[in-house]
Structures are given as structure tokens and as C-alpha cells.
A protein has these predicted regions:
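Catalytic beta-strand/loop cores that center a nucleophilic Ser/Cys/Thr
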Residues: 92-172
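Aromatic-Pro/Gly-enriched surface loop or interdomain linker
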Residues: 1-29
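Extracellular/periplasmic catalytic domains that process cell-envelope and extracellular macromolecules
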Residues: 23-25, 59-60, 152-153
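Structural motif
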Residues: 28-35, 66, 158-160
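Alpha-helical scaffolding within the catalytic cores
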Residues: 14-21, 50-53, 143-147
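A glycine-rich, often tryptophan-bearing local segment used as a flexible ligand/cofactor-contacting loop or short
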Residues: 37-119, 170
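A structural signal for short, well-ordered beta-strand segments and their strand-loop junctions
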Residues: 11-13, 66-69, 160-161
Length: 174
């Protein structure tokens, strides 16, 4: 989706972050895209506290994080989405069924949706069973499943997108 867009794109591996966490200081936004427990989103690498704290610290200090699908998806220490704190969302895997989930108000007037017709987005297949954590702005939800959310984390911001097939509108969302 970024091909041809006016952005400098740099691919950073988890190994790059492990060797030198300051590699994140040279970028503005991190994007983590894919299904959980895959090489794309990291899988077991999120069990490494150096990786986890470097990424979360980057966002907390003012960086941006865009997560698509199941970003940081790996069941560990009571969480499935290891980037839940900065993104403000979590996947219901059966461990939080007894938690009250009252945060379902949509904020379709959010600036992220300003260029979208009818303030809507095509999420393709998207992901199921994603819920918002306290303090997260749900921009779009469908049947009590978060499709698009924004969450301030320290001085930075996380944005969760359930799916992002290529289109002009989705390019604008990014």
C-alpha cells in the first residue's frame, strides 16, 4: 500500500532492533502487519524483553505504530497481542470473557477518516474477536468487533486496523 506513496520506507528486522534498539530513533512510524505467530508479526520474538521494550518505548517517546491484522500476535504472559498496550486493542482468545467491555462508541469524525467517503474503510476479511482496551478511541467497529482504533500511548500513538486490502482510500488511511 505504500508503493508510490511519498514516504521513505525502511525495512527493519527484529534482529536489527535486538542488535541496536536505537535503529528506531531514525524512523517516525513502525508498521507491523500479518497474522499472529508468523515471521511477519514476530511470533515468539515478542517473548524477548529487549525487543518488546524497545518497540513500546519507541511509541511511548513519541513514535507512531500501525498494526494491521494480529500485530505482535503471540500468546504470552496473559496477552495475545503483545502490542496491545500501545495499540489499545486485544484479541479475545477466551481468557478475558469475564472482563466487562463497555468501550464500543465509534468516533467516525476522527482525522484518520477525514478523506474516506462516508467515513468508512474496506477492511477486507479483517479480524474477528478484537476488542478495545480502556482509553482507546474506536473509529469503526462492526458487530462489537474493532476494525479501526487509535490509542495515545505516552507521547506517541498506536493505530489498529483489522485488515487493509489495497485501494486508493486505504492508501489515504495509511
Amino acid at each position: 500500500a505504500l508503493s508510490g506513496a511519498p514516504f521513505d520506507v525502511k525495512f527493519i528486522s527484529f534482529d536489527d532492533i535486538k542488535v541496536d534498539p536505537k535503529v528506531l530513533d531514525s524512523i517516525d512510524v513502525l508498521i507491523n502487519v500479518g497474522d499472529g505467530d508468523t515471521a511477519h508479526t514476530g511470533g515468539k520474538v515478542w517473548e524477548d524483553p529487549e525487543i518488546s521494550s524497545a518497540v513500546k518505548g519507541f511509541v511511548h517517546r513519541g513514535g507512531g505504530l500501525i498494526g494491521v491484522g494480529e500485530p505482535g500476535g503471540h500468546q504470552y504472559q496473559g496477552r495475545y497481542l503483545q502490542l496491545a498496550a500501545p495499540l489499545g486493542v486485544e484479541k479475545e482468545t477466551g481468557f478475558a470473557l469475564n472482563y466487562d467491555k463497555y468501550n464500543w462508541d465509534e468516533h467516525r469524525d476522527h482525522f484518520i477518516l477525514a478523506d474516506c467517503p462516508d467515513h468508512d474503510v474496506d477492511f477486507g476479511e479483517g479480524k474477528k474477536n478484537i476488542f478495545a482496551l480502556e482509553g482507546t478511541e474506536i473509529l469503526i467497529q462492526r458487530d462489537k468487533e474493532v476494525q479501526l482504533a487509535a490509542h495515545e500511548y505516552g507521547q506517541g500513538r498506536g493505530v489498529y486496523i483489522s485488515g487493509l486490502p489495497y485501494s486508493f482510500v486505504n492508501n489515504r488511511v495509511l
